[in-house]
Design a protein with these regions (language model features):
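N-terminal secretory/targeting leader peptides
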Residues: 11, 24-116, 124, 128-353
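N-terminal signal peptide c-region/cleavage motif recognized by signal peptidases
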Residues: 16-20
Length: 353
């Protein structure tokens, strides 16, 4: 159940927004996660940038841990102005955010920065994505990522797609569907429960990310990392209420846009570093627990991508039926992925130039 009464909360938010407008404007930001880790650091950096770029005239006040509303309520809550800003997860708003959910399909780059920049440009230039955000009464400002999908397994090494058959794997989203189609027995529950499930033998492998394996201590109960480097979950956005955004002075709207774009690079920098550090630490050993890393062969990864085509077709059918052009979205997304991959190869990451 949502943690707010929409009309009452929207009224309170409007009063708070109006009262602050004479001196400084404070935007309430609903965030389901806690104020800890690399993504939270990027969000705090974003808020500081907004304040700096507006000389303190525009500020963001985070409400962490779902204290205003839960993750499933964020899109509607921000659209109804129960909070001025928030983070949304595309899989929780599959119907409303069909075009944006292209970022969760197993088609994009597994490079964190390339994926984030491609999604940012798509979300800020695609007429289809703009239509979806407009319908929700929100404006897109920036993007997050889970980073690339990996597996950590207990007494099991997967080296080809045939190895998925019969393996119990905790997974989610399109990636879980692909593994299921390959014969895996996919269980869907919170990643925070995976450690106990691995230890108990309820699952053999967990779909996770390198930094997540370290945080959740998967390495304590499972020793084999299958480095799939397979796509990312990129349908994860920063949004602001459209009416609130449009009423801000032009310089403040510009500051929000520019800080949102800059935050995309900051998220990439922090997440890539977190993954690198986590992998190095787990390989070296943490508290006596070491992992072995197994690179999934490129030829087999190509088969994974091929297996995902069925689910792309399903997304396309739903997206077209909802009045969008799935082919146009996919073509632009793929072109942007190629654009930023070429830039990365030519110039390296922005923070390394």
């Amino acid at each position: 159940m949502p943690k707010f009464a929409p009309l009452a909360a929207a009224g309170l938010a409007a009063l708070a927004f109006a009262a602050a407008a004479s001196a400084e404007t404070v935007l309430r930001y609903t965030e389901p996660s806690v104020n800890r880790g690399e993504r939270a650091a990027a969000m705090n950096w974003f808020a500081a940038e907004v304040a700096k770029r507006t000389n303190g005239a525009l500020k963001i006040n985070f409400f962490w841990g779902g204290s205003l509303m839960d993750a499933r309520s964020s899109l509607k809550g921000v659209g109804d102005r129960a909070a001025e800003m928030g983070s949304i997860v595309g899989s929780y708003t599959a119907r409303e955010m069909l075009p944006y959910n292209v970022g969760d399909l197993p088609v994009g780059s597994s490079d964190v920065w390339v994926g984030l920049r491609a999604m940012y440009e798509l979300a800020t230039t695609s007429p289809d994505l703009k239509k979806a955000f407009d319908a929700a009464n929100v404006v897109y400002l920036g993007n997050f990522t889970t980073t690339e999908i990996q597996l950590i397994c207990k007494n099991k090494v997967l080296s080809k797609v045939e190895d998925f058959k019969g393996v119990k794997i905790r997974s989610a989203g399109f990636y879980g569907q692909v593994m299921e189609s390959l014969g895996a027995s996919v269980l869907r529950f919170s990643g925070t429960e995976a450690n106990r499930a691995l230890d108990a033998g309820t699952i053999t492998c967990n779909h996770n990310y390198l930094y997540g394996m370290r945080i959740l201590r998967d390495y304590e109960v499972a020793k084999d990392i299958i480095k799939l480097d397979w796509g990312q979950h990129l349908a994860w956005a920063v949004i602001v209420n459209k009416e609130v955004f449009n009423k801000l002075p032009a310089d403040q709207r510009k500051a929000l846009r520019e800080a949102g774009s800059a935050m995309v690079d900051k998220v990439a920098e922090l997440m890539i570093s977190a993954n690198d550090n986590a992998l190095a630490a787990m390989k070296a050993g943490i508290g006596g627990h070491k992992v072995t890393v197994h690179e999934f062969p490129e030829a087999e990864k190509a088969k994974l991508l091929k297996a995902g085509e069925k689910f792309i077709a399903e997304w396309k059918a739903k997206t077209d039926a909802a009045g969008y052009s799935a082919d146009r979205i996919l073509a632009q997304y793929r072109a942007l992925t190629e654009k930023y991959e070429a830039e990365r190869k030519a110039k390296n990451y922005p923070w390394k130039r």
